[in-house]
């Protein structure tokens, strides 16, 4: 049998994969990150069906008595859909985010109300992550919200974030949040259902990578070598997953359109790409 690209990248020992997958299934505190493409349609309008599916998936975790924090993109995209045109300047992008963020939160509020759940909005900048006192205040607020069974919905505060204080990417924001709140699992939902050896939208021979661990450098090299902007967009997701794995937290990159995707993770199914702690051990 000929060796595939996935084989050449090296594999994670199955015992390590199974242990990390079990830890992911048993995670008590989960950070879920949803990207813009997981929430909007091709015209950048907020897609009600996509948002409701995300909430349905999160509600399943809540019913399993898990704490869930949602890091949600989509504000600028939702703003474009509401206003009717895109941004040409930083100021326009920031203004669109304010329009879109309010619309996004209104829809989240409505959708979670179907499950008699309340939500709270938290907007952050890089300064909030870097300043110990401010980050501690953020974590304390999150703890209180979770004690009240309220779902924190987190996004970057685009309206006030200048280039110097921008986090720049919600993949990195979700990684920082997961570490800061002592999460047991980070799930990044995207419009591609896993990390592949190529862009699955363009390459029919692209293979799903089941797990990433000690083979991270090869995976990172593969992603960075890609010339496709669509596939290249997964780079920060891979980096964010790697970051939390350094703290003993399993991470999964999976498709937002996958049926019952969070339920599959919570029941130990093999879905998406699993990032195990890089020391090859799962967190105790």
Swiss-Prot record:
One of its GO terms (molecular function) is ATP binding. One of its GO terms (biological process) is L-proline biosynthetic process. Keywords: Amino-acid biosynthesis, ATP-binding, Cytoplasm, Kinase, Nucleotide-binding, Proline biosynthesis, Transferase. Pfam families: AA_kinase (PF00696). It catalyses: L-glutamate + ATP = L-glutamyl 5-phosphate + ADP. Gene3D superfamilies: Acetylglutamate kinase-like (3.40.1160.10). GO terms for cellular component: cytosol. The keyword Ribonucleoprotein does not apply. It is an enzyme of class 2 (transferase). Pathway: Amino-acid biosynthesis; L-proline biosynthesis; L-glutamate 5-semialdehyde from L-glutamate: step 1/2. Substrate binds at residues 73, 158, 170. Belongs to the glutamate 5-kinase family. HAMAP family: ProB (MF_00456). Catalyzes the transfer of a phosphate group to glutamate to form L-glutamate 5-phosphate. NCBIfam families: proB (TIGR01027). This is Glutamate 5-kinase. It comes from Natronomonas pharaonis (strain ATCC 35678 / DSM 2160 / CIP 103997 / JCM 8858 / NBRC 14720 / NCIMB 2260 / Gabara). The lineage of its organism: Archaea, Methanobacteriati, Methanobacteriota, Stenosarchaea group, Halobacteria.
């Amino acid at each position: 049998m000929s060796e595939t690209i996935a084989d050449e990248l090296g594999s994670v020992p199955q015992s390590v994969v199974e242990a990390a997958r079990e830890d992911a299934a048993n995670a008590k505190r989960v950070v879920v990150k949803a990207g813009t493409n997981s929430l909007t349609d091709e015209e950048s309008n907020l897609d009600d069906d996509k948002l409701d599916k995300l909430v349905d998936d999160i509600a399943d975790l809540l019913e399993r008595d898990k704490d869930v924090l949602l890091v949600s993109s989509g504000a600028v995209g939702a703003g474009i859909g509401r206003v009717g045109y895109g941004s040409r300047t930083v100021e326009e992008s920031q203004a669109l985010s304010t329009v879109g963020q309010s619309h996004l939160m209104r829809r989240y509020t409505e959708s979670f109300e179907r499950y008699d759940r309340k939500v709270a909005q938290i907007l952050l900048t890089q300064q909030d992550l870097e300043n110990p006192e401010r980050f501690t205040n953020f974590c304390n607020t999150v703890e209180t919200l979770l004690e009240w069974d309220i779902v924190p919905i987190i996004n970057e505060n685009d309206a006030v974030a200048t280039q110097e204080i921008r986090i720049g990417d919600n993949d990195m924001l979700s990684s920082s949040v997961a570490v800061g709140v002592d999460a047991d699992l980070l799930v990044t939902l995207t419009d591609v259902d896993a990390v592949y050896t190529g862009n699955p939208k363009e390459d029919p021979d692209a293979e799903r990578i089941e797990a990433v661990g000690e083979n991270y450098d090869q995976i990172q090299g593969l992603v960075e070598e890609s010339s496709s902007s669509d596939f290249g967009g997964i780079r920060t997701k891979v980096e964010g997953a790697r970051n939390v794995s350094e703290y003993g937290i399993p991470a999964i990159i999976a498709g937002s359109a996958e049926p019952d995707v969070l339920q599959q993770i919570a029941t130990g199914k093999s879905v998406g790409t699993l990032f195990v702690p890089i020391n090859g051990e799962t967190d105790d």
